[in-house]
Amino acid sequence: MLYLEYIVLAALVVFLSVRLSYYVDCLDKKTNLSGAFIGGVMLAAVTSLPELFTSLTAVLALDQPDLVQGNVLGSNIFNLCVIGGLMLFTSRRYQRATLSKSHSKTLWFGLFMYALVFAAIMMPKEVGFSFLKVNLMSILILLVYAVNVKFMGNDDSGDVEEEVYISLSVRRIAVRFICYSVGLVIVSILLTTVTDRLAEELQLGATVAGAIFLGVATSLPELSASVNLVRIGNFNASFGNIVGSNLFNFIILCFADVLFTQGSIYVNEPQVMNLLGFGAFSMVCTLVVIYGKKHRALVLLASVAILGSYVTSILLSM
């Protein structure tokens, strides 16, 4: 019964995220907002809602900070696997696609955030008041994210003008977008409690359970949305969704750090270090996918490396 609950909730996450990706594509075509901003900030934030609310539930209701690290870091590697997997099947179409320049900048910011999380674990430095203390690196992560959002908001280098008729008004699109977002939040909270029960039943560590069950399940929105966007030819928003979600996931650690008052959210464990190392490696490989866009063999090689990185990280974390 527990596994059935997990599957049903995961399926609901997929359905809701596919609908969200459709309305994001509608906004992309009906407004003057840059495609990089819509995919990398709006859609990224919405498809990261499961990571956000599952992590907050893990901290506030379940007292499981290890679930948060496994969820966020595991989700980040899985997200990049989506790009790797898509490239294996759509590399020829990808070579003809137009991408915003900000995507590579976002990945560089992401690598910097990995370094900040590593520093938070190895050299913990808390700032704040007696009743509210946060790791200094959490503040720096928020600042880095804010700078990246500014870059994305001004980047329209990947936008392509196309005449597409959409019958819905911007207002109706926005209302439906919000409704599906709320549904995604509710399902995400339920998914966290089921994952915690699965971890107990299978006697898995919280970090491993977070990386496998939460990391994969909460990445289903990114997977579904990105596959759907590539299917309709919007590679730019698809890439923005993945790399933007990865950056947004890092600030989830910051929120959890503020709310968890019984210790540090940044825990030094071998499983966490594995996820950090392979996550950073996957980001480097994704940069190769972007910079080597015209060289199909290089794109395919980097994509295989991303997929191999995820499998290896999970095996070493068991």
In which residue ranges do the predicted regions lie?
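Hydrophobic alpha-helical segments, chiefly the membrane-spanning helices
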Residues: M1-M318
